[in-house]
Amino acid sequence: MIPKTKAEGVPDFVLLNQITENAFIENLTMRHKSDNIYTYIGDVVISTNPFKNLNIYKESDIKAYNGRYKYEMPPHIYALANDAYRSMRQSQENQCVIISGESGAGKTEASKKIMQFLTFVSSNQSPNGERISKMLLDSNPLLEAFGNAKTLRNDNSSRFGKYMEMQFNAVGSPIGGKITNYLLEKSRVVGRTQGERSFHIFYQMLKGLSQSKLNELGLTPNAPAYEYLKKSGCFDVSTIDDSGEFKIIVKAMETLGLKESDQNSIWRILAAILHIGNITFAEAAEQRTGTTTVKVSDTKSLAAAASCLKTDQQSLSIALCYRSISTGVGKRCSVISVPMDCNQAAYSRDALAKALYERLFNWLVSKINTIINCTTEKGPVIGILDIYGFEVFQNNSFEQLNINFCNEKLQQLFIELTLKSEQEEYVREGIEWKNIEYFNNKPICELIEKKPIGLISLLDEACLIAKSTDQTFLDSICKQFEKNPHLQSYVVSKDRSIGDTCFRLKHYAGDVTYDVRGFLDKNKDTLFGDLISSMQSSSDPLVQGLFPPTRPEDSKKRPETAGSQFRNAMNALITTLLACSPHYVRCIKSNDNKQAGVIDEDRVRHQVRYLGLLENVRVRRAGFAGRIEYTRFYNRYKMLCKKTWPSFNGTAKQATELILQQHNIDKEEIRMGKTKVFIRNPTTLFYFEEKRELEMPRIVTLIQKTWRGYRARSKWNQRKAAIKIQLFYRSYRYKKWFRELHRAFKDVARDPQWGKQVFWPKHPSILDRAVQLTHKIHNCWRAEKMILSLGAGQNHMRQKVMAYDIFHGKKKWDFRRHFDADYLEKPSNPNQQKYVLAMQNLFSTYGDTEVLFADYVIKVNPKGVPQRRGIVVTGTNIYKHDPKNYKVKKWGTPLVDVTSISISPMADTFLVLHCKAPQRDFVLDLGCNGYEAVSEITTVIVQQVLKLTGVKLSVQFTSSITYNNARPKGSDTILTFAPINNDPKLIGSQFKKGKGNQATIQFKD
């Protein structure tokens, strides 16, 4: 933080060798000329406007300041923003940044830089953070377009006050925000000082909208064509690209979720305001009554305004030229229409334009708040106050009084928190202190706002009296404050520099003369009911919404004046700021000509004086950078001392002393008050924070370990208890259900249908699996009973039905032949006895219990040679026998390993059984015995596999079959079928090995 050269000055005014005004100005000048526009007074940032772009706001600069302490880096507004963000995260308390200074000092830019920093460092804390940050940032250009204007002192002057709050969650990610606006200078819409502009949005709209859209709104891009814009004679500003800014605004509207219909309504309202400004009036004689009335002389502008507002042209014309007045009360109440003169009509026209713009601006702020507001979570906020600076013009009116009153309130807050309250706290805590004098502006604030005798109260009183004028109001304040040293007038002081319609206030920033002409009208802020009714009849939902119906209970109330509204808003703002931990930015305007690199010492000196910066330096230098309550200090830093960690039985003050002693803090560096410890140098606070940050990971690990152990033990015990309870409960429910089931199926064994019509009792969901198993057991038992009850004829019929289902329409089969199953057990088999003995041996060896099919077949071996074999299909396996001795060839093939069956649709007698590896496929000829047996073995295998697995085998009928009855992979054989009717030697079907992997079945068709 120490400057590189003496020419750069000291980075903190507290470090000056001499605390004098000249030394202060000299240091400020040196730093400004070396482009070091930021300087500290302790925690306060002093910012001078360089009137040029500086390369100190890059993303790399934000990263450099993020998470660093002030003393580690050169002075910067990012350092203050980082302090606010860190304080918010550490304490979970609301923070606010109060930016003050006169118009053109750089307050708006300062607020944008703070927002830029906060959104960047916080948006990566959660997925939603970046979206919220972008919406908060995009609200800035939108509000600037509608709320800022070019003035003589500032090309981008805020003509409204704004307090923007960013809300964060516990981890520091933005979750929402809120914008509160104060006193929009709506009079700027209809008039302003020569050389100034109206609000930016009018010029941006005219240059940014397409020609077709302008034509639709009845507009021309030529700004001087509109009375409201040409009055001041300023249309373009060299530092503002109106066309480019308009594109940014439209993009911001889209980001914030403003629908296209809303955008179109906004352009129509703005266009209507410009058309309203072009409406002129002329007097006309009323022949019937002989009186003079007023009428709209420019009907073209009237029609354009009515079209944009989507309201009736005639009703708008009447509302501008006539005023409805209620007479009498109750049943005698009547409404009469009173014509206005040209001046009154012009006043009514301007009032409508101002009301439209102000209500549109308030709607826009409300719309943004609806979009960015967070209602689901609560968390600390960081508020940024960007409000108009102190203003002194050649002609100062009601608006300047309110603006300067606002600055007086903020100066009073600064004095209360940094000068007055700080010194009072030292005395209250028993700290030795030499009092430092400062200018207290409290009497001026009371002069303006005090009730019942204050400028605002007297102005409200004048507005209540029908015959009051601006002059009678001036007379009343001159009389009331005749002896008040802070208010002067020509009547009281005979000072000829004060006009006879003016009074002068001695503000903290200097004397300002106010002209009372227009004070009453501006305070009343009257908009006649006829115009409100005309707007309420609009078919545009937005225009209607800007003028909501008056509630019956509100219609009897006297409307609050503009002055009272602003006073109440200011008091509410001060209450909000007092509830936050403040951070200050004091902006100084380097010169009035907006020249880069130039510093006007006289102008700067004046600002330094009225801002009380020198007194701030003296208090800061003589005082203490930090003060913390003993309890809070102990709770935050107790882990830094063995004697206070993890708990301490003494007082918080004693614990604080022990912590300071262990770290050898110099006695001159601290003072022990009655309830707080005072620390002189901020580096001491930073030292404790750094030590705490180093210690926290160890403590967090310890807490996590302890908590995880406790949680794991608790969960384990809970789980054991839960399992035990579940077991007992399930056992109870299962037993109860089984008792009900037993009663339901009591006589099921004697039931002819074995319980088919019995209703199963309802069961709880926890028994789903058990009930499924019980159902399965019952179904198996019932199926067994049904099968055992079937006669041989019934089973044979079932097989025929299945065979029909498989073969019908796909291959000819002998449906008349009886399925005898075991053909080898018949007496016709010459080796019957050998077969029977072989089957007995097979059953005892392999555990099979029944034969479903047995017959002689021709089996094709892996070499492609047909061999005569006996094939036996049992309840679980397929066996191959040598027909000579009936020995099992190799091993049996499980039926569940059969994956599909392939058969040709022709007249041959072959079939292929496809099996899972490592089993080989079977290629069988079942026609060697003189009868068709393909249908029987196919039906038997399909039926038994369905019984074993619940899956019906796929039977494919195809004229080309690929099979593999050899071990190696890739040794597939393609089998085709060829009918041959001219070979007398061919009997039945024959297998012919072809070349390569080809083979053919020859048969007589």
From Swiss-Prot:
GO terms for cellular component: actin cytoskeleton; actin wave; cell leading edge; cytoplasm; cytosol; early phagosome; leading edge membrane; macropinocytic cup. Pfam families: IQ (PF00612), Myosin_head (PF00063), Myosin_TH1 (PF06017). SMART domains: IQ, MYSc. Residues 539-562 are annotated as: Disordered. Residues 556-630 are annotated as: Actin-binding. Transmembrane segments: none annotated. One of its GO terms (biological process) is chemotaxis to cAMP. InterPro entries: IQ_motif_EF-hand-BS, Kinesin_motor_dom_sf, Myosin_head_motor_dom-like, Myosin_TH1, MYSc_Myo1, P-loop_NTPase. One of its GO terms (molecular function) is actin filament binding. The keyword Nucleotide-binding applies. Residues 694-722, 716-745 form the IQ domain. Residues 8-693 form the Myosin motor domain. ATP binds at residues 101-108. Residues 551-560 have a biased composition (Basic and acidic residues). Residues 810-1004 form the TH1 domain. Keywords: Actin-binding, ATP-binding, Calmodulin-binding, Motor protein, Myosin, Nucleotide-binding, Repeat. Belongs to the TRAFAC class myosin-kinesin ATPase superfamily. Myosin family. Myosin is a protein that binds to actin and has ATPase activity that is activated by actin. May play a role in moving membranes relative to actin. Myosin I heavy chain is single-headed. Dimer of a heavy and a light chain. Inability to self-assemble into filaments. This is Myosin IE heavy chain. It comes from Dictyostelium discoideum (Social amoeba). The gene is myoE.
